[in-house]
Structures are given as structure tokens and as C-alpha cells.
Regions:
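A short secondary-structure junction signal
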Residues: 24-26, 63-67
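C-terminal functional extensions of proteins
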Residues: 81-138
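Short, acidic/small-residue loops that bind anionic groups at enzyme active sites
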Residues: 1-16, 55-56, 62, 69-94, ...
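A generic secondary-structure signal
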Residues: 43, 71-74, 103
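Acidic/glycine-enriched connector segments
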Residues: 1-54
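Glycine- and other small-residue-rich loops at beta-strand/loop junctions that grip anionic moieties
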Residues: 33, 54-57, 86, 116
Length: 138
């Protein structure tokens, strides 16, 4: 952050206390720590109205994907936030969550998912920025 300071946006990095391999992001303007990972995950999903990018992960990442799918489906907080699965091979072949969720949405089992699959950082940025244009700010 010292090399590339910015004051336009505020962001929050929330690595879990439990897993040492999840370091804080150097790009966040603020850092928080939770001692209970499930509380951390729920908090992140609750406040992430601007979107979430899922990179290849393990059990916790899968839980977050489905937790957020439920929040978006029911519009639990009055808004559905965009979600991007980054890593086409991982999310379609290694851990084929994307095709399953996409099919459930097409069949009407899930709604409001706003789910994108991409390997392209520019496309991902565009998806998130385009969503920001639709949010009515007071």
C-alpha cells in the first residue's frame, strides 16, 4: 500500500486467525481478524455488496460459495451481489461447482445468483464495475 497508495476506496481484508496460510492481503486499506472462521465467512459475505471473486480453494471456499448463493437467492440483505469464479478449469473440471450451480439456476432452483466464470482479470473487473453502476446510492 505504501508503494501504490490510494484514497478513493476503502477495503477490508479479513484472513482467518485459524489458518496461517491465509495471510492478509497487502491491498486492503483495513485488516480485521476473527477467531471463529464461520463468523468471519458470514461477515465477509454479508458486507460484500460489491462482489466476491472466488479463486481456487478448498472446503471453506466451497462453503462460502453456497452460503452466498443462499443470501443472493433469498435477497437476505436486500441485494444480490455478483460472484466470479476465477479459474475455469478449477471450477468446471477439478471442482465442478460452477456447472452444478449454473444448471440449478437455469432450472429455477436458485435465483439472483449473478455468477460469472472467467480467467480474464479485465472481464472480472468489468463485471464488478458494471454491477456498481446499478446500485442506487443514497
Amino acid at each position: 500500500m505504501h508503494r501504490y497508495p490510494q484514497t478513493k476506496y476503502v477495503s477490508l481484508g479479513v484472513p482467518t486467525w485459524l489458518y496461517g496460510h491465509e495471510p492478509s492481503t497487502p491491498l486492503a486499506t483495513h485488516i480485521a481478524k476473527y477467531f471463529v472462521n464461520s463468523v468471519r465467512e458470514d461477515t465477509i459475505l454479508t458486507i460484500a455488496f460489491g462482489g466476491i471473486i472466488y479463486t481456487p480453494g478448498s472446503a471453506g471456499t466451497l462453503r462460502e460459495i453456497f452460503q452466498n448463493a443462499v443470501q443472493n437467492h433469498y435477497l437476505s440483505f436486500g441485494i444480490a451481489s455478483p460472484r466470479v469464479c476465477m479459474g475455469k478449469q478449477f471450477w468446471t473440471e477439478d471442482v465442478p461447482v460452477y456447472p452444478m450451480i449454473h444448471q440449478m439456476e437455469e432450472r429455477g432452483r436458485y435465483k439472483n445468483l449473478l455468477l460469472t466464470l472467467s480467467d480474464d482479470p479485465i472481464e472480472i473487473e468489468t463485471v464488478l464495475k458494471d454491477f456498481q453502476k446499478t446500485i442506487p446510492y443514497e
